[in-house]
Amino acid sequence: MKRIIITIWYSLFFSFFAVPLFADKPNIIFILTDDLGYGDVGVLFQNQRKGVQIKTPELDQMAVSGTILNRHYCPAPICAPSRASLITGLHQGHSNVRNMQFDKAIEDNWNFANTLKKAGYFTIHLGKYGLQGWGHSPDKWAGYPTKRGFDYFYGSVRHVDGHQHYPANFWEIGDNKSHQGKKEVWENNREVSSGLDKCYTTDLWTAKAKQLIIDRTKNNPKTPFFMYLAYDTPHAALQLPTTPYPDGKGIKGGLEWLGAPGKMINTAKGTIDSYRDPIYTNKGLTEVAERFATSITRIDHCVGDILQTLKDLKIDKKTVVIFSSDNGPHREAYIKGERWNPSVFESAGKFKGSKGSSYEGGLRVPTFAWGPSIIKAGQKTNSTSQFHDWMATFCDYAGLGIPARIDGVSLLPTLSGIGKQRKSTIYFEFNNQQGLYLDGYKGIRMKATSHEVDFEIFNTVNDGPESKNLAGSSEMFSRLQKRMKDEVLRIRMPNRHAKKTYDDELVPGIDIDKNKLKNGVGTNLYKGTWEWVPEFSQLSANNSLLRKDLSITNIPIKKNNGVLFSGYLLVPHSGAWTFHCKSTGQFIFKIHKKLVLDADYKYSGEEISRTLNLSKGIHPYRMYYKDSSPKPSISLQWESEKVAKNVIPANALFVEKPQS
């Protein structure tokens, strides 16, 4: 069977069929919009609201022909941390990019590009990036896309370069010099903005995407590709295209890549920032409202153009398209004397909040998946999922083991409607805001100035607007309040560049009857060859043993095999505990859901250490180990103020007794 293109208009991804069905690996395209609100899309809200509506017929058709993920969440209500979590598969409790850390280099570790590259994919990033690090050129940017697994990059690198959508043109009405001036566009190691006169970036990224899809389908039909297409609209500046959308769509119409300086695309003509979609003129809207609506309908045309291209190339039935947004709707215009308010079109739908807020309006993003014969059509799911689930999903499509370090789960069962969906960990963190889902309820605290601050608790299935705070309303919700406070400490690791008031809190143990435990270490062995330490718990064990300690002495392990140690640690006293580990192979060590030690990507055998504050009691752990040596060895040690550095003793290691 020929490969499948998974075009991700960042929303939901492919289907349960992927791994067993594909003789060749599917192509993957992920398309992410910038600041598009849940309520900005017709099928989700606009078509039902009163007054002038934003029209998105192509997106509407895409959504109803596929699966709508009605409760899909970004990890933070602003772009940089959201995009970092998307790329790395880590939520905001583990990501190295948090809060307002624009332009911070994304960590050098496994991500959705370099994992797929290991599976033979040609990897492409188009559009907005913003995770490159400091400097002025690719040789200085530590986190440049081609240094993070992308074979080809064409787009804007720095955060501010995505705020003006005519990179080669001065924009006189911008409200400051940054929003007026020209911007850089990079193609791999070459800055190319001088040839982009009158190129509106929404059109530019789309034309390049079409060109690459057509060229690779024609010239490299046996090599799968992954395309991450990240638009920089409808984020401000609220600029207009030059012309109406070109007639037609697909390979015989729509946007076209011409490739000539000054005439790079077929809409690079006329006057910049001039075309208002006539469906919004003479309707009593303000100039800024016309601009905002036009920018969204332009994206809609682009989606339809790309989908038609897939159909024209006869790869639509071998393609999955995902659509989504990085966070909720914005409040900026970047125009002299003008302001924008997302309430004009109710861009958050009926939800409370917008960009920058961890209420639903800032975090619940429009997301859906489309793929004839692949994605379950006409499905609307209310199961919760989040950005970090996409990397796991992509690995599943490519037939790869899911890296143990990441926080996500594969969404294939949801997208196909077949099989049991693993529960996603939903966690939010941004400045002093923090939240999670637990037992189906959303807990959110907007000003977590200390860990004692209570969560507001909402049932977002029945109360999307978050109008009824359930916290303290019954004994059940009082218990849930405590559990939420405990759980957020078990999910995340502190980041020294994004400090929180709760960083130094003791991580609580779990409530479990010690009489139901016995000394030992659960030890599962796995056969296989993996580029990284995989999530062994989702694989079938070749053998299961009960060991006394965390060692591989006398374990019948062969080169390139794996081991999962699991059980419970009995921590003898509360305080700071440092864990040290050194190995001939690669390993991942987790306590609760906390990623404590990560010695997988580029690990070279040195001892690594991490300190965390643990309360006295019982804490679940998992140690994932992948052997890469003919003489394997691993040593996990701990120490505290009262306990000298030593191997964790057997009397501190427990497993559950078999049920009689």
Set out the residue ranges of the language-model regions.
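Sec/Tat signal peptide C-region and signal peptidase I cleavage site
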Residues: V19-A23
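Loop/turn elements at helix/coil->beta-strand transitions in domains of secreted/extracellular proteins
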Residues: D24-I29, S65-N70, K117-I124, R148-D151, ...
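Active-site-proximal cap/lid insertion segments
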Residues: D35-Q53, A142, H159-H388, C395-V409, ...
